[in-house]
A protein has these predicted regions:
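Extended, well-folded catalytic/binding cores that form a central cleft or groove in large enzyme
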Residues: 1-245
Length: 245
């Protein structure tokens, strides 16, 4: 699914630059609410819908050098925004897939940028229990539901990895921006699913929730409230009902 953002080409409607600002702010190792320790950080505005939790250690400045850990989905989000050299200019010395063999680097902090799936959360908890990195800053591409967050917190505590986590943030950037005002939700095989006579109601609910979450990320990144018009009985109206939840 690839969609363009309408309207005149202006800074306020430049989706790619807005998403880039959110991602570079994430890489600055600064809190979404400001760096309480007074260390350096990006001046780019954070996503107005984002939320975060900081578990800052006492004293010390943020280390500008870091490791970036992503999954295949979030790699597709970052790739159109930042080249390898640009990542290095933001202090990223190494970027690795979450589900790959990774050696411990205990003297360097890590920025995790992944989807909040059960598989990803279990992998992060294992990393924290092994203390692979100095501190871990967790950034999720979309909202992590409260029950999932509570289960993740219990898992981290039970495995002894809580001290490894520096902060947790919802970023709401669940889309890949290909051009200034062109994006894709990277929904695999969506046409097949929607036209599959064997698809269950649960399958359709999950797909619609995913699309609604991606569209919410777009408007959250732009910092605007959309005006959407559609017929009273239509698939778009069904999608908007998911979007409003």
């Amino acid at each position: 699914m690839t969609t363009s953002v309408g309207g005149p080409s202006s800074g306020s409607s430049n989706l790619k630059s807005s998403q880039l600002a959110a991602v570079t702010n994430m890489l600055a190792l600064s809190s979404a609410n400001g760096n309480e320790n007074g260390g350096g950080g990006s001046s780019a505005p954070s996503n107005p819908y984002g939320r975060g939790y900081d578990n800052k250690p006492g004293g010390g400045d943020d280390n500008p050098w870091k490791i970036l850990i992503y999954d295949k989905h979030t790699r597709a989000i970052i790739s159109p925004l930042l080249s390898v050299s640009q990542l290095r200019s933001h202090g990223v010395t190494l970027h690795l897939l979450l589900h790959s063999d990774r050696e411990p680097i205990p003297d360097v902090p890590a920025v995790y940028f992944v989807q909040p799936t059960q598989e990803n959360l279990s992998a992060i908890a294992r990393d924290c229990s092994r203390h692979l990195y100095q501190r871990s800053h967790l950034h999720f591409s979309t909202r992590m539901e409260r029950p999932v967050m509570e289960e993740f917190a219990r898992l981290v505590v039970n495995t002894g990895g809580l001290d490894s986590i520096a902060s947790v943030h919802d970023q709401f950037v669940e889309f890949a921006c290909l051009e200034n005002r062109l994006f894709t939700l990277n929904v695999a095989a969506s046409y097949v699913l929607y036209n599959n006579p064997g698809a269950t109601e649960g399958d359709m609910d999950g797909a619609m929730n995913g699309i609604a979450g991606g569209l919410f990320s777009v408007v959250a990144t732009l910092g605007c409230v959309p005006v959407i018009r559609c017929r009273r009985v239509s698939l778009l109206l069904t999608l908007l009902l998911y979007f409003s939840q």
